[in-house]
């Protein structure tokens, strides 16, 4: 680790890898943990001191009282959901107001944004993207069109600004003939959330971060979702509305590219995807169901079944390339403990043509597999890589060779103690 750098921790396939747990493990190394993109559409699950927490907006370094946590300008925030999340943490004994700063430049998700999200999705009919309905897309639309509200707006003339934007939303909804909704109670909770947010330091976080870096402090940028959900580099249009790749760290926190240090790419030992969109490695058989059951593959925010499949090296290598990944972290290795053999996708095939490069559109491409022996060993009690069965060592070595990137951490269970740092 180099002092005065921002290390990025990124999901590098479709998200849901377990970034929250790794941030929790990494936090002692860093002075600041910052989220740079996304909103309450992605939940990071952490088991801390025996209790399960799902963090949707708040950085995962919040459990360490000696660390500053930052919600950066690239994020979008729903005040009501933020308040509910924060209250749960406060009731568990964590002092958030001394540990969390929020960028004044982050955009606000209004109750009507969530209605617009549902309305836009309904209008697509069969071509639904599979949105979480949290209002993320409509909020980023207004950010790009320069009509949104930001956190800093709650400090001055906010009621007038809010009512003006709400009226605009109501007109759009009327034009879409989407009028069967009542947000009265939701709006009340939202306004209470705004008042609660005023109790936190609402700051120019880009200035804070750059000053901290100049003082030699270390920052961990906590990614949300994954590379294949990036608005530019993902499986468009079945993507999120923000830049989830390493470039988003710079724009979402206001730091220069030369401030980036290590780029940690986190992935599962197999593949999952939530929602609609192409997924060449998806398994529709009992194997896919078994992976889902053993891995508890259900969305942390929506509860939706995750689609499951074998590891996709085409997607993994593409993500390593666009992010400049320097180290890999393999999660949920223990989920594959019971399999006699494990398949790995090495290429895609369509109309008799094979490719190892990520196509512009992955719809209709089928996975080409290579099969490796399984390890048939319970990994969950292991505490060092010396205990790894040879088949797992071979699996790790195979991935490292194919990706030309070292796997420096292997997770063998959900608890922070079940995280093995390789020598």
Task: Cite the ranges covered by each PLM segment.
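Non-transmembrane, aqueous-exposed alpha-helical and coiled segments at domain scale
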Residues: 1-423
